[in-house]
């Protein structure tokens, strides 16, 4: 059984032939991906990763060091790489997923059969926006409001925001300090998901994810902004489910 603090598995599946590990954006949680479970192929088991500092782990200290997070999360994931698997990450989750796969390769662990990079500039691009993680509270909240991913009722709830701020600042610390070096391409197929109106992720920078993979590459662009994974969730689910179904047919038919 999976280590429950780290993994939310809405539909455990002992007969699964493929696992999908899902990683959320900065400030997000496993809840983003739970609706996916009802619409994926029957032979796919969805594993939504829940990091410390949010959801049921709200009382735990969040990570501010991406390298340490990768090492600790990788250790939790290792026993569950016994099936072919894919990784889906949105925004910060894409970069976290990429660093996990780099770590797996270094450790000579099984690599994913597919990687979904969603709503993120390619990992060799460093964040060029003015850092926000150390802003005074009011200014920090205003920046969050400008991003559009946090409900207004949450931003206006002072008590709730007091609980969330350590996690939010920690996530943005990792986001704003991350830049991956160019390394040999990963032997893995890639799907790039993006928002046509995502002002923070130019499509050219999004498509440059393909520089980091040497497998087949496909692109799906949605008519949304940065948080298209929330605003266009049904379409994202359909795109992911279709790709996973093709993987099961093409790559796992003889398993």
Regions found by a protein language model. Give the residues of each.
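Domain-scale detector for complete catalytic domains at protein termini or as standalone homologs
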Residues: 1-88, 95-255
């Amino acid at each position: 059984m999976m280590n429950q603090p780290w993994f939310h598995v809405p539909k455990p599946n002992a007969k699964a032939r493929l696992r999908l590990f899902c990683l959320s954006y900065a400030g997000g949680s496993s809840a983003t991906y739970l609706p996916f479970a009802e619409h994926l192929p029957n032979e796919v088991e969805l594993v939504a990763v829940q990091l410390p500092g949010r959801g049921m782990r709200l009382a735990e200290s969040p990570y501010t060091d991406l390298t340490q997070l990768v090492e600790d999360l990788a250790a939790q994931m290792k026993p569950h790489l016994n099936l072919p698997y894919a990784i889906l990450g949105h925004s910060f989750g894409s970069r976290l997923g990429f660093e996990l796969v780099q770590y797996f390769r270094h450790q000579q662990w099984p690599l994913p059969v597919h990687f979904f990079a969603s709503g993120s500039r390619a990992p060799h691009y460093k964040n060029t926006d003015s850092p926000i993680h150390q802003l005074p509270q009011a200014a920090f909240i205003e920046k969050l409001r400008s991003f559009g991913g946090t409900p207004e009722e949450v931003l206006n709830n002072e008590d709730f925001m007091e609980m969330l701020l350590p996690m939010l600042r920690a996530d943005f610390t990792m986001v704003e300090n991350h830049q991956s070096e160019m390394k040999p391409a990963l032997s893995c197929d890639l799907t790039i998901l993006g928002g046509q109106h995502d002002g923070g992720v130019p499509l050219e920078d999004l498509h440059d994810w393909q520089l980091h993979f040497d497998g087949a590459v496909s692109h799906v662009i949605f008519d949304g902004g940065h948080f298209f994974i929330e605003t266009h969730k049904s379409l994202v689910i359909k795109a992911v489910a279709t790709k996973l179904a093709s993987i099961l047919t093409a790559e796992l038919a003889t398993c």
